[in-house]
Amino acid sequence: MTNTPTAVDDGPQNQDTSQLAPGVTIECRDEQWLVNNVSKTADGFRIRCRGVSDYVRDQTATFFTALDKIQVFDPADVTVKPDDSPHFRHSRLWLESTLRRTPVPLYQENLEVATQMLADPLDYQLSAVRTALSDDRIRPRVLLADAVGLGKTLEIGMILSELIRRGRGERILVVTPKHVMEQFQQELWTRFAVPLVRLDSQGIQKVRQKLPASKNPFSYFPRVIVSMDTLKSPKYRAQLQKSRWDAVVIDEIHNATNAGSQNNELARTLAPTTESLILASATPHNGREDSFKEILRLLDPLSVRKDGSIDMQAAKKLIIRRHRNSPEVASVVGQKWAQRKEPRNIPVEASPEENAVARELADTWVQNNLSSERLFPWTLVKAFLSSPAALQETIDNRRKNLEQQDNHHTELDNLNHVADLNAKVTEEHSNKFIALVNYLQEIGVKKGSERRAVIFSERVATLHWLKENLDKHLNLGKGAVKVMHGGLPDTEQLALIDEFKREDTPLRILITGDVASEGVNLHSQCHHLVHYDIPWSLIRIQQRNGRIDRYGQEHSPEITALLLDPQDADSIGELHVLTRLIEREYSANQLLGDAAPLMGKHNPKAEEDEIRRILTRERDFEEVVASPEDIVTGAHAKVQPSEPAAQDDDTDDIFALLLAAEEASAEASTRDELETDGTGVTGTADSIRRSLYAAENKYLEDALNEAFNDQAFAKTQAGGVEYVEHDNDIVELTPPKDLQRRFDYLPQDYVSYRKVAERLMLATSVPKGEQHLRAAREGDSQKSWPRAHFLGPLHPVTEWAADRALASMPQSEIPAVLGDVTEPTVLLMGTLTNSRGQVVSRVFLSAQELTFLRGEDGTKTAQSSSIADVHAWLREVGLQDRAINPGDFDTPEDITALIAAAVTAAEDTLEMTKTAAQEKANQRIDAWKQRRKDWEDHGNTQRSLLVRDTERLIQQESELLVSMTPQRSLVRPLVVILPRKRA
């Protein structure tokens, strides 16, 4: 039986694409290709595939049905060949690889690969993944608004890995702030084997130089990570608008919500170009409803009505939000996230020299306000409370400005007087600095000690002043004290963060500005944080504290604030106000997981202005900074109308929505705990491995032995890869040229630093993978890339080995094996795909001949039965790693007729599945149409620019929804199992 391509009419426009789906083989340009991904275009399909015929083997290519003549091989037209390999290795490889190459349905409830990664998947994190992939939503578009430290990056990694397994993650774009780009890239690669190529402006330019002028640089790499600062440039907008992504991640999305800003334009440009959109921010609400509505519109244009009001029920489904003390989080984090201690506020009695400066500021500047700028006296106060260096810098800058103007002699004289007083506040006469030294020595920061601390200050001048004097007074040695601030180059910032994470470096004290307060992890080796000066903002305090108070922190975080207490404290009023600010942030962290609602400004600058009004006695602290308990009461009243709200309640609607989302997330976690995952296992973290292989390295080993004729261990010159399996969960191999080519799509810093093109080391167990990851961060390298990379289910090396192993197998052939069956049995896979070529449903069937029934033309008939768990079924029939293969058996002469009958029976069964899937899709369409009607009916009739833009997005989503309905079914025979008695 020979398999010939489906006949088509001449010309690409007349092609039969009814069987085009992932996993089929096609012929294009006189070569054969295995289809990996199919996506709809305006005039046909885009087909991403990998070469299987000799000339193009292992090469990747993209074809368009509008341009190329595509011939599809009928997957049901196969020949059967008895498998004579040891333990039916060839068949197990073929089946495992085919199952992995075929995407699982997008809406499959079971998590396929997320629990098999190098992560510690807690139930609340897996619940977030399930929620993102739920069939309640048309496509995965969510806002991950978990509080600082809950592991949003891990959740993103799990969502992306599941999307990849579902055939929805071929092209991925991740956009982050530049200072967390390397950290994000490392997490996704080391833990999930999701490779992102890091691009900056120079990187994009290098790609452009490799391509024709008309080629889009963002099409060169399938998965990339770029900083928001780089990508927001208008010069990239045209290329971004033309690019299409399967998934886009935008981290710290609150930086892109101000309408008209370049960041916002970037987010608006990217949102329509992707099917899956993951937005992340611990502080998504900046106090302006319009900004939060921008986030909602990016995710779902129907979530904000025409009149500008929010559809609360729709919006709630878009948001996933929890915090450290949410019940579903607190119950599982345990020692993986030690409870934060109450803050320690250290009041420091000012020295005579400090008191002299404070008195001058209070009497001359604050009370008399002789400056031409009303707020400048408080700028001086804030600088004074930071350090003598910060105050001197402020004075110098002011003098430069005034010297260029007339009529400021009095102010200049007073500035000079303050400068003279300030010059006497050396480190020996700065009691706050002395208190810092005493505190650091008290907690054990000294020469030869492993203890570390991170010190925050708002002023760069203070950072350098502290470094200079701590070096002098602590004598910790070279490289023990370092400074980081936003003025440093990106590479230097990333290197400092990386150095502070690792155990083997001499760095003991990191003195940093607020550039490190957002998104940077500093908890690996540190649980002591010092506020040398205190921001006049709850948000900034919370962001700083979150650097060490986060998941993975095994020691109770200790937050300490140094509070200078001058004799004239009442005049500049700082001590009691900032003490209460620190305490309120702690209370909010415990109850809400977020301090921003206490002031309702959601913006550090706006909060600072309000705190200044408290200091100037214009407002009372309780008026400006609400208690967390009052906030919860007000929010509940907004969400639950049955609960009476206080008349003066000013809790904003957005926080009420976030609280409702938090409660919905808790309900989802509870449901996940009660429901099974489809395999009979309750809970979420203990997921069964769905594979014919007990471990990933066994799959790799079989693939290598099959590919290299059982000589994988041989030297490369002898046709092997020098494969070695150590007894400590480590394997090694020397990558051949075809594998090295795939390394072009890995993080290049990892490839070059670990020299993986020369020798590749893989960790085959989670404990060993964690050990190497920890060693890279703590002791044995200059960079945080692990020496042995974890071998997870999406690892490109395993994919390469399987491709290489099956390369010589004819595309029209399936194996036959011996098993525990009574009659010849055909295992088949049926898939339903939509018009975009995506798998909507996947079923497995076994079929046997109906010996008592023949077709009208005398042909065989068969009966098919559904298989709930194909891996368990294959093990039950005996296809296991120790299966006995006598190696000498034949297939029945009428096996071709049996396969034809099995395919017919399977098609009948699949038709019922198709009907049910179409009904589900129609329900989804009807529900969406009703939402669209409500949107159109709700609000004014004026068609503003925003409304017109929203209408365009709604129409785009309408077309997408229709294209996602099941349209085509495909049945593929996979293997024939013959009774052992035939041997």
Show which residues each predicted segment covers.
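Charged, non-catalytic accessory extensions
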Residues: M1-G11, D16, E31, N36, ...
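SF2 helicase/translocase NTPase motor core
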Residues: D58-V72, D77-T98, P103-S134, K152-E155, ...
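Walker A/P-loop
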Residues: R139-I159
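Hydrophobic positions on the alpha1 helix immediately C-terminal to the Walker A/P-loop
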Residues: E155, I159, S291, A435
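Inter-lobe coupling linker of SF2 helicases/translocases
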Residues: A213-S214, Y220, V224-W245, A256, ...
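A short beta-strand element within the Helicase C-terminal
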Residues: R244, S291-E294, V520-D533, E558-A561
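Conserved RecA-like helicase motor core of SF1/SF2 enzymes
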Residues: D514-E554, P566
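Conserved segment of the helicase C-terminal RecA-like domain
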Residues: I548-R580
